[in-house]
């Protein structure tokens, strides 16, 4: 828990005069990184792995933050704080750090990052400040990559379907069954925020949520409005493209300095990664059925108020992992929790973003609570999640967000001597 003096310092850091974030190196390289880990177009039939992409984003931002913070030293480091001249270029350090992490993905990306970094560095005046910044960023990137080398991200997916010998089960491979065993960036364990079990199938709440989803989440629903359908499709997008553009705009609107941008965006990037670990821990621990399974088996759940619909289908393809709790909800809850805790209010400047899954549609928000609520409703209207699961997911995310702000990269008690 932060002492009162530290919270006062954090408030001063966030309300002090800052450099406008237009063209900020942190937001620039966040955008580049998102395009690398989840390109807008890729080979036919290839689906980017959301959780792997978010892990890389966490590493990119941790490297940028520790590089910039080694120069300014206004926060405690995430992993490492290296000696650095105060005159060292923050822009060169952050760019080299981000490129250094991304270059480890594969040789093709390494070649692309070499060119991207050279182009970016060409905009920075030559001199010792620039060269020192590049060296600093490269060293920090290497240390972040080394620290995450054996975090379990590359473990094989060994999910074992529950079945009776000789009986067919759907043959598609589930997603992220190994992710509950990945080492978190900040949480003490994957199960640190594991929620209580799903509600009883015999309860009134189950019947209420079942029937809400059955009515509003079906592919041919006559209850769901055109606006609700649009919102459901808007939030079919997943991973870094769903949340990082929102955060970039928020940083810009708040006119954060380079270091405060690095701090805030690293909290979010690490928080989103740990939220995915936490939600997959809960999903595979409880192994709760998806609506398409529940509604087609509504006659065997022991609840007389849930009527079976033999041909029911969701609005879009159901994600290939257990239902409880809602993953999109824990991610939006994490973003909302971090922003609300850092800024001291859920109210924000108006932020507008588009979606890769709803071309031509723009959504706007002025409140983080409303942002998280929209995501929760979207997952119900898409036919993927029950109301109780969205509430639990959002609450988990808010807890993780609050934990991130109060547990990592806190304001330094005093400026370190250079």
Where are these regions (language model features)?
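Bacterial N-terminal signal peptides
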Residues: 8-17
